[in-house]
Amino acid sequence: MKPVNIFFIGRKQGVGLRRFRLSHLENRRPAELEGLRRASSSIHQVRLIRNADVVWVRVRPEFTTDPERRRIEQRLRPFRDQIPIINDIAVFNNYDCKDTTFSIWKEHGISCPDFISFDTFQYTYNHSDTVEQILKFLQKYGKILLRTNNETAANGMYLLNSNATGKEIDAIVDDLENRCRMFFPTRSGTRIIAVEFIGSQDAGGYIDLYRAHILLGQIISYYAVTSKQDIFHNVDMKEQCLERFIQLNEGLCDKVQSLNDQILQASTALECNLGAVEFFLLDNKPIFIEFNPMWGGHASMIGFGNTKVQNYLDTHKKALKERIPNIYAWLNYPDYYKALFEQINKSIQPIVH
């Protein structure tokens, strides 16, 4: 199969004085460069965008400013109708602003949490009305997340239970207002949102979070993590969660296949063609909560769970590899990214040749 040429562009690559350098891969994950080198018979990185068969926009949304977006947009505009673009900067708000994401999903009949959002005028000039709306929303659902709409890693996020008072909410809104004012000059889409909390449906109190990775209309990988914490990250998964973690991933292949169309629709509705979509399962039906165009968290760098979980998965690899192949395929980072770049070739080939 003929190799395709790829051009990378981001905040620090493919624009300005950095537009011609090949020695850098923005937001690279461990072993991603090695994977790109291993896939050299399928894909070549090029220095000039006009020589590309495909362009990959690589930005970390939470650090990307409006001026940086405009620079990338200006660079892409002359080529947009000529070259396929992976995650065009034109759809940045679709995944960066959680309220925009939820709105689009709801418009397409895709299940996601309920939410309300407040623009700058509302919470600056109608502070008391904002607090009142949040109180009513909390009364409706009993537990909610109050947060900024475009931060990650639980930054700018509060979990409110039904016993939260108006005074407590008022103080949180004050803090979030200050965060919005700090970000607004360079990230004008920043807003306050209240989001329905999707809690545990498990008798043991576990919350199971599923993630599927999508590339150009294909699900290329997936996994599930679990915890008893209301808000948790991969690193929070402890050894007590191991049995459930293994069970969840053991049956995940068939489950993902049955949800294939719904998972892909969550991506295409946002006009994104690469990224990680996160969801819960309630009565075996997905509730989508987030789309991340550049996954690069704990699982992508170190592995699953805390050190004890990682050690267990490593020492029991021989016994577990047949049961949870998706986990070990993911952890083999060089081969994983080699396969990712080869898949770009397979997907782009019919378009360019």
Model-derived segments and their meaning:
Residues K12-D129, Q133:
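Conserved N-proximal alpha/beta basic substrate-recognition cap immediately N-terminal to
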Residues R70-I72, D99-T100, Y206-L209, L274-G275:
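Short, surface-exposed coil-to-beta transition loops
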Residues N155, N161-D254, S258:
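Phosphate-binding site of ATP-dependent enzymes
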